[in-house]
Design a protein with these regions (language model features):
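Long amphipathic alpha-helical repeat/alpha-solenoid cores
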Residues: 1-190
């Protein structure tokens, strides 16, 4: 918990830099916020949200890792440490190539990457991943379950052009459960 004078300093630093003083900003002292803002400005990053979850020196390391590997600096990137990002980048680059080095891919858990990417490769649909990375938010078991469901309703794992994964993979767990229920009800009506 920040003392009131520190909160006043934080609000002042935020106002001076056009940052809304809310949420994760208050996790850092004003001095650290100034350092973070400086790193962000030097690298063309908007100082909002997840950048305030890490110290300025970690943000510098993350920026360095991303720039060295040609990765866009999005908010999601700052949810991982530079070390984790580098491990993921190395794994993906060495095993699958640089075209898979996208923020939505490299920020996933390494175990997820190892199992899911390998599975997608075995299925012959890995090429779709850079354009349709939301499938990585599912576990391997959820992917297999949804794949079985998709086949059961006569659809394919990818869209007709083979450019994106079937939209079923992008559904939230709740929406997916509703879709399954809807299909069961259709079967009952028949």
């Amino acid at each position: 918990k920040q003392p009131s004078e520190e909160i006043e300093k934080i609000v002042k630093v935020c106002k001076e830099n056009g940052i809304e003083p809310t949420g994760s900003v208050f996790l850092k002292p004003a001095e650290e916020i100034e350092k973070i803002v400086k790193v962000c400005k030097e690298n063309g990053i908007e100082p909002t949200g997840s950048v305030f979850l890490k110290p300025a020196e970690e943000i510098e390391k993350i920026v360095k890792v991303c720039k060295e590997n040609g990765i866009e600096l999005t908010g999601r990137i700052f949810l991982k440490s530079a070390k984790q990002l580098q491990e993921n980048i190395n794994y993906i680059s060495e095993n699958y190539g640089d075209k898979y080095l996208k923020p939505l891919i490299i920020t996933k858990n390494i175990k997820t990457l190892q199992t899911v990417i390998q599975y997608l490769e075995e299925k012959g649909v890995l090429e779709i991943l850079p354009q349709s990375a939301s499938i990585l938010s599912l576990t391997i078991d959820e992917i297999k379950e949804r794949e079985k469901f998709i086949e059961g309703i006569g659809e394919n794992i990818s869209n007709k052009n083979g450019t994106k994964f079937n939209s079923i993979f992008g559904l939230s767990r709740r929406k997916y459960a509703q879709r399954v229920e809807k299909e069961k009800n259709k079967e009952v009506e028949l």
